[in-house]
Amino acid sequence: MKQPDRNQQQGAKSNRPAINDEIRAKEVRLVGADGEQKGIVSLNEALRAAEDADLDLVEIVANAEPPVCKIMDYNKHLFDLKQKQKDAKKKQHQVQVKEIKLRPATDVGDYQVKLRAILKFLEEGNKVKITLRFRGREMAHQQLGLAQLQKIEADVAELGVVEQAPKMEGRQMGMLLGPKKKK
């Protein structure tokens, strides 16, 4: 059986705090299990206090002079940290850019359907890219497309803000809307 690589073992220990016998300082600033300051004590005294409480001595701030150590249940501490990370990940919302495509001659009913979709995306906290595609002779009437994008901007004013003003890109005119910041 292959022996584990020494560098991997060292790396695994380096990203976690030193606990119990791994602490190398002669004196430490001790914090009790209840969070109260015990003052600066020798390492042996701190280890004895942790052992008496049937808990671990964990180095919280290693680069302080002397290092700050706390008496706690290390495994419970790790579990709590993982739970906090899980909860933070659940609450995190990935902002996506949704795209809505229109034509300059989009009729009123179709416009209302597209507008409802835009409002729904903005309520969910997503950005919306609106693309207006011109065909053939429609290129001569770009002001109609600009007027339609300005109408959309006015219709979504209470939920969204323009992040990128309307601009022509080849045969398409595009605009980017973002949700208004919640207070």
UniProtKB/Swiss-Prot annotation:
The keyword Electron transport does not apply. Residues 1-21 are annotated as: Disordered. Its main location: cytoplasm. One of its GO terms (biological process) is ribosome disassembly. Keywords: Cytoplasm, Initiation factor, Protein biosynthesis. InterPro entries: T_IF-3_C_sf, T_IF-3_N_sf, Translation_initiation_fac_3, Translation_initiation_fac_3_C, Translation_initiation_fac_3_N. It holds the Pfam family IF3_C. It is found in: Cytoplasm. GO terms for molecular function: ribosome binding; translation initiation factor activity. One of its GO terms (cellular component) is membrane. Residues 1-13 have a biased composition (Polar residues). It comes from the Bacteria. HAMAP family: IF_3. Monomer. IF-3 binds to the 30S ribosomal subunit and shifts the equilibrium between 70S ribosomes and their 50S and 30S subunits in favor of the free subunits, thus enhancing the availability of 30S subunits on which protein synthesis initiation begins. Belongs to the IF-3 family. This is Translation initiation factor IF-3.
